[in-house]
């Protein structure tokens, strides 16, 4: 998967996922005989993406489709090479639960697989070497030894701890345009607690994706 563009990958323990996920949202809900969940992560957009305006960044700033392509190919490869039934885990929302409830938590898969840890920046997973990544998962009946979650959380970074000690805020808190982030750091410089106002974030970050609302504003 690295040759195809993945930066990191790991195997999540299916039984751990079943214990943590809400009822009906563990891997076995999608594939009853699943033995392993493979999680992989790809990097974000190019450096130039961050020099573009907000409207442009809304369309080119993420690379999750590359992660999905790699995962789809991996599922086919496992079936061809090992003869074990596999599926690309759909990243879509549950049509019976509305627009905010996914069929599976790709974030949880990655966290349990040890390729990301939750941060103060809106609970985004961070990797100590690759930072923020986009994730995809493969469910397979091939039994693989599971990896473990990260022992050390890369968040907060020492420089963030220093700023928090001086101002009471980490950089992500300070520069969030809608003040949707809050939290605290303990005496050892470790993440103590965090709060993320998802509604405030969505109102700002998805304004260029919510086409109906844009049209409504135009008609007003």
Which residue ranges define each predicted feature?
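Non-catalytic, usually N-terminal nucleic-acid engagement modules in DNA/RNA processing proteins
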Residues: 1-65
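Catalytic cores of enzyme domains
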Residues: 20, 27-28, 56, 60-220
């Amino acid at each position: 998967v690295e040759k195809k563009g993945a930066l990191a990958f790991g195997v999540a323990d299916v039984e751990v996922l079943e214990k943590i996920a809400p009822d009906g949202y563990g891997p076995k809900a999608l594939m009853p005989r699943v033995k392993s969940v493979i999680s992989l992560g790809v990097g974000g957009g190019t450096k130039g993406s961050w020099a573009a305006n907000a409207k442009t960044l809304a369309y080119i700033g993420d690379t999750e489709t590359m992660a999905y392509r790699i995962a789809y190919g991996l599922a086919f490869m496992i079936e061809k090479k090992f003869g074990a039934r596999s599926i690309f885990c759909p990243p879509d929302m549950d049509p019976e639960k509305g627009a905010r409830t996914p069929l599976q938590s790709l974030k949880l898969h990655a966290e349990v697989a040890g390729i990301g840890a939750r941060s103060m920046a809106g609970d985004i997973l961070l990797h100590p070497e690759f930072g923020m990544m986009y994730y995809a998962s493969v469910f397979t009946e091939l039994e693989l030894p599971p990896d473990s979650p990260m022992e050390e959380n890369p968040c907060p970074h020492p420089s963030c701890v220093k700023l928090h000690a001086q101002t009471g805020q980490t950089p992500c808190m300070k520069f969030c345009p809608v003040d949707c982030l809050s939290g605290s750091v303990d005496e050892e410089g470790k993440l103590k607690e965090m709060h993320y106002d998802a509604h405030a974030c969505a109102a700002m970050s998805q304004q260029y994706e919510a086409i109906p609302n844009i049209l409504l504003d135009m008609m007003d």
